[in-house]
Regions:
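Extracellular/oxidizing-compartment recognition motifs
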Residues: 1-403, 412, 428-431, 444-447, ...
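Active-site core of glycosidic bond-cleaving carbohydrate-active enzymes
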Residues: 408-663
């Protein structure tokens, strides 16, 4: 498929491998040039972008793809945004550091404006777009988190965005980049509703520069190097987390009747207020403010309050945007999406009047296809919360969270894929998610056969989760039921065979996996401390995966192996009452350890190692004695409790299978 007629990938000359490089692209056109009604902007980029027409927001992208591949967005431009003379702007940030969010690749933009079949404007070294560095954005800043690239920090003076009005002159030299392997976007174009934030629920004062306060030893600040890329601490133009660490709240007053920004948001030095968006959401933080003197403002934000206040690093990420302002009036919107309910503007110096705060949300629009109604309104609220969770977590991939990581994690994806079909009636996000795992010839830094635990992402530290690769195969098996004619299933056969060949290298004399390499992940609980030796939950997963692969690709040897492993687990793990988690070597002989976790029991039944009719007492104990009140009831204290992910997920699945959805 041809995605561009004339456009070529370009970037500022010699700067395509520069970290955190922000570039503004602009072109102008007259509406008389348009010969039809279908005006479409096509965009591909290695970074993230924001497109606007005549100052109005058009969209954010791109949808992510595997290393070396780039998805093309096609934005239909509404006719009501057109004027006689039009200005199209595209802001692009090329991070060029490893992350779980945007992979490390040289910067480029490829863009083309077409009306019907006529090319109106296009990028090339001598094309129609001018470009210049976004100098208002501080370039040498710290990472947002271990998983995501850089924070956003600004140094502003009035007129910083005049370039968007076409006053930036001839621009900086552009250089054509190598041709790119392009893909369709496939997933729906997001919804970008604007959520106005007017309610102020608290205000107070703070002190800053407190050197005696503890400093957060964030690895993404202090451990920049060969495996975690970024700017070294001594090169940073702004050390936001260190500034925040030196701040302490002095007074905090929560209003009995919340005030409104309509009443004015005047903040003097060392003052703040806390605004409430009313619900947790993900999107781009916008603010309009003015100041009559030079001022420094930090906008911190979070999903919850701790002791009535906002913590900038509760989630092990830097939830703060830095503004250094000269006197003037400003409207600003972040180009990266963040997740929050509460926002706390803090004036470190100077004084500002905040006129407006909003979040331009970023959501998968397809969730509106589903409807649910129950007499019990609490069930309706749960459903809507689930719908909202999916909409924020799956705009282009299945992410485990839309905040700290924005990463496309396996295992999470197994469950989210089920939800996509239920809420949207399609599997478009899953198509992209699986295709991304198909496309690379190899995954750098990982052993042969292994796939990344999350993707698209970079893993120069060589970390992987073998269990998650097995969940990938289980998801692919269920995907066959959702999309039986998909070409991805036969195309991924070699990937599946490679994973299982990798795992087979760690089978012991009983055919069980022993001393699995990498990060062995059962769930976030005591179970993750019992993974040495022969880990039985991992082997339960392995057995189920082999059986799924045998059905996918009609391979009898996988089926036979899966059944043998099941039998061995039953022989070795079950102590007469519980399935125990692991066995260790003593004098060369495997010895079952007494440790037993709640999640291990769920693994046994979920993956078919145990069946209700064969282990009725255990199954009934799980149904009757376990659950959220087990500890309070003092039942089975020797069994380590499960956590939400994934133990409680599996428990709910077993309750559903047993005909107990209400429980």
């Amino acid at each position: 498929m041809t995605y561009f007629k004339n456009a070529r990938p370009v970037w500022l000359t010699g700067r395509e491998k520069e970290k955190n490089c922000g570039v503004g692209f602009i072109c102008c056109f007259n509406s008389r040039e348009l010969s039809g009604n279908n005006l479409v902007l096509s965009i591909a980029s290695s970074g993230i972008y924001r497109a606007c027409l005549n100052g109005s927001f058009l969209g954010h992208g791109p949808a992510r793809a595997a290393h070396g591949y780039f998805r093309v967005d096609r934005i239909a431009i509404p006719s009501d945004l057109l004027q006689e003379n039009n200005i199209l702007t595209i802001e692009v940030i090329s991070f060029y550091v490893n992350s779980f969010y945007i992979v490390e690749q040289p910067g480029f933009l490829q863009a083309e404006l077409q009306c019907d079949d006529k090319v109106i404007r296009f990028t090339d070294a001598d094309g129609d777009f001018r470009a210049h560095t976004l100098k208002e954005r501080l370039q040498k800043v710290q990472r947002y988190s271990f998983q995501r690239p850089f924070i956003e920090a600004f140094r502003l003076e009035e007129g910083f965005d005049d370039w968007k009005k076409g006053t930036c002159g001839s621009g900086e030299p552009l250089c054509r980049q190598e041709d790119k392997q392009l893909l369709e976007r496939r997933v729906p174009w997001p919804d970008f509703p604007v959520l106005q934030i007017n309610k102020i629920i608290a205000e107070g004062t703070f002190d800053s520069g407190k050197a005696d306060l503890p400093v957060w030893q964030d690895r993404s600040l202090f451990e920049i190097g060969d495996t975690l890329h970024g700017f070294p601490l001594d090169e940073l133009e702004e050390k936001v987390s260190l500034v925040m660490d030196g701040c302490v709240t002095c007074t905090l007053t929560s209003g009995q009747s919340p005030s409104s920004l309509d009443d004015g948001g005047l903040l003097s030095e060392h003052c703040f207020f806390i605004a409430d968006a009313g619900r947790n959401t993900t999107g781009f933080i916008g603010i309009c403010l003015e100041c009559t003197q030079a001022s420094r403002v930090y906008i911190t934000f979070d999903e919850v309050l701790l002791n009535g206040d906002v913590s900038y690093n509760r989630m092990s990420c830097v939830n703060a945007v830095s503004l250094e302002l000269k006197p003037g009036k400003y409207c600003l919107e972040t180009i990266q999406p963040y997740t929050c309910r509460y926002l706390k503007p803090m004036v470190l110096s100077g004084s500002v009047n905040i006129r407006d705060i909003y979040i331009r949300e970023l959501k998968n629009p397809a969730v509106s296809q589903a409807s649910f109604s129950a007499c019990d309104d609490s069930l309706n609220r749960i459903f809507e919360a689930g719908r909202e969770t999916f909409a924020q977590n799956a705009p282009d991939l299945y992410m485990d969270c839309p905040s700290r990581e924005r990463a496309g994690w396996l295992c999470d994806s197994f469950f989210t894929a089920r939800v996509e079909m239920d809420l949207t009636g399609n599997h478009l996000v899953e198509d992209n998610f699986l295709e991304n795992y198909l496309l690379p010839e190899q995954f750098p830094y990982l052993p042969e056969g292994m796939i990344p635990m999350c993707y698209p992402s970079d893993h120069p530290d060589g970390v992987y989760i073998a269990n998650w690769a097995l969940w990938f195969i289980l998801e692919l098996y269920e995907y066959q039921g959702r999309s039986p004619q998909s070409s991805l299933i036969p195309a991924l056969k070699n990937r599946v065979d490679g994973i299982l060949a990798f795992m087979a290298r760690y089978e012991n004399e009983d055919g069980l996996l022993e001393n699995i390499p990498g990060w062995v992940f059962v769930e976030w609980s005591k179970a993750n401390e019992l993974t040495d030796g022969v880990n039985y939950p991992s082997n339960m997963l392995y057995s189920a995966t082999l059986l799924a692969a045998s059905r996918l690709y009609k391979k009898e040897e996988y089926r036979q192996k899966g059944l043998r492993i099941r039998c061995k687990i039953r022989e070795q793990s079950f102590d007469g009452q519980w399935f125990c988690d692991h066995a260790l070597r003593a004098d060369g002989r495997l010895v079952r350890q007494s440790d037993a976790t709640e999640v291990c029991q769920y693994y046994a039944f979920f993956f078919g190692t145990a069946e209700q009719e064969d282990y009725p007492d255990l199954f009934n104990r799980l149904l009757e004695d376990f659950g959220p009140d087990r500890t309070a009831r003092g039942l089975h204290p020797q069994i380590w409790p499960a956590n939400a992910f994934i133990g409680n997920y599996l428990r709910m699945e077993l309750l559903s299978r047993a005909g107990r959805p209400a429980q």
